[in-house]
Structure formats: C-alpha cells, structure tokens
From Swiss-Prot:
Keyword Nucleotide-binding: yes
CDD domains: YajQ_like
GO terms assigned for molecular function: nucleotide binding
UniProt name for this protein: Nucleotide-binding protein Tola_0795
Organism encoding this protein: Tolumonas auensis (strain DSM 9187 / NBRC 110442 / TA 4)
Family to which this protein belongs: Belongs to the YajQ family.
Length: 160
C-alpha cells in the first residue's frame, strides 16, 4: 500500500548559512555602523543582541529575508519577547522542529473531513499517511500544503 510521512524539519545547514549572511549584512549596513549587534546560532535557537529594541525588529526582518533567500519557510521561526539587560537588548528566535500533537490532530482532522480514502497515524513527531491509490495520497498532500497551521510541512518516505 502506498504511503508517505508528513514531517516538519528545519535544515540546520541552511539556517547556519542564513545567520552568517545576516551577520555579514549587519556589519555592512549603514544604520548598524558603530552598533554592537549580532546573531548567534545555538542548537535550536538564534539569539539576537543589539543596543536598541528597534534594531532587533530590523534584525528580525533581515533574518527572515535571508531565510527566504535560502529557500526555507519563515513559519519555522518562533520569535520570543525582547529582554533588556544592562544597556543591551536581546531576543531569542526558536526554530520549530517536529509536529506537535495538537497540530497533528488538526492536520488529521483536515484530511478526514475531506473524505479521502486514506488512513493517518501519528508516529512521534511525524504523521504517516497510507492509502490504496497514489492519487488519494497526492490529494492529501495538496490539502496539507493548503492548510495554514503556522508551520511548514515536508513530505518524506514516499513508497509505492
């Protein structure tokens, strides 16, 4: 029986490239001259630091622009609150990895409401979709692409 998996993953090498490009742009931009601003990539988050909170807003836009240029979806970013410490401002942007249970249930409900002849199963942080016909699976893929659940989804492990 044909099947595929729905996952939500972030290519960390692309994120690293986007962060490096954003750091380069901050160093060359005129409005960031003489400002101690930087992006720092940790395991699952990007920490931004600047001298003013409006600069953090500009830095988020720079980061989003660089991520889009790397071919990724910006819905994988979860922007945190601005923190003030001394004379610097910090903000943490978390990277969304995996499909949470409540999002998975909403996705399964969307597929089941369409009355497509497929079965769905939650397997950890991914969803397995199986069906008798390849066309049904492609229809389910189209539904998932149209669903706006605040997260980017990819399809892996397609088997006939």
């Amino acid at each position: 029986m044909p099947s595929f998996d729905i996952v939500s993953e972030v290519a960390m090498n692309e994120v690293q490239n986007a962060v490096e490009n954003a750091n380069r742009e901050i160093q060359t931009r005129f409005d960031f001259r003489g400002v101690d601003a930087s992006f720092e990539l940790n395991k699952e988050e990007i920490k931004m630091g600047a001298d003013a909170d409006f600069q953090l807003k500009q830095m988020i836009e720079i980061l989003r622009d660089k991520i889009v240029k790397r071919g990724m979806d910006t819905s994988c970013l979860d922007v945190g609150d601005v923190e003030h410490s001394g004379k610097r401002y910090f903000q943490v942007v978390k990277l969304k990895q995996g499909i949470e249970t409540d999002v998975a249930k909403k996705l399964i409900k969307i597929i089941k409401d369409a009355k497509i002849k497929v079965q769905t199963a939650i397997q950890g942080d991914e969803i397995r979709v199986t069906g008798k016909k390849r066309d049904d699976l492609q229809e389910a893929m189209a539904l998932v692409r149209q669903a706006e659940l605040g997260q980017a989804f990819q399809f892996t492990n397609f088997r006939d």
